[in-house]
Amino acid sequence: MIFKVKFEVTQMILTSLINKSAKALVIVAFVAAPFLAHADDAQKPAVHVTYEPQLDNQRDPNQYCAKCHKFDKIDKNQTLDQSGGELHFGKFHGAHLDKKNPNNGKAITCVSCHGNISENHRRGAKDVMRFEGDIFGNKKPMYSVQEQNQVCFACHQPDKLREKLWAHDVHAMKLPCASCHTLHPKEDAMKGIQPKQRVKLCVDCHGEQQKRKAEQDKLIEQKDKL
């Protein structure tokens, strides 16, 4: 009888110890789980997250520019494909809109001529190509003649331009293309004027050049007399 009681007591003690041990193991496993997971993650290669902004209208870069450079004199519901080459972004006309680069066959977009914008573009950063044709202005252009014309030469090859008109041989290297050609022509790239009237463009430019030279010579002469 005494042996039986001792055996039952011993069994109860063992059962109690086993239950306590099991509970302790559960607690340890619960506490250690985050640390074990962290250690496992530490062994994995680091994942570098790169921010890649997704631009709307990726298939039509012109629409992305048009978000800020609003349409003018055109139905806002009209798409670029329906514009008939008369799309306006302020002063923009779309003769180039339906064209492709003859050298690579890619469609011409705003980016083709003006380049990609930076993240500061919307804050007013002057980070795109600007074509300035006022050769008599006092303000220095943002981009040199060579930089401006190289953009045009990406499609309009200099050799072919010289063959088409002798004036390109001289002027294309010293003057910006924009001084004679409109940037966003509706039809004719040559200031939108008729061929018979184009000579007036030459006369006006060279006349102004001679006038300014005469004024400069007069000032020099007056200084010499002082």
UniProtKB/Swiss-Prot annotation:
Heme 4 binds at residues 177, 180-181. Binds 5 heme groups per subunit. Plays a role in nitrite reduction. GO terms for cellular component: periplasmic space. The keyword Heme applies. This is Cytochrome c-type protein NrfB. One of its GO terms (molecular function) is heme binding. InterPro entries: Cyt_c_NrfB, Cytochrom_c_NrfB-like_dom, Multihaem_cyt_sf, Multiheme_Cytochr_ET. Heme 1 binds at residues 65, 68-69.
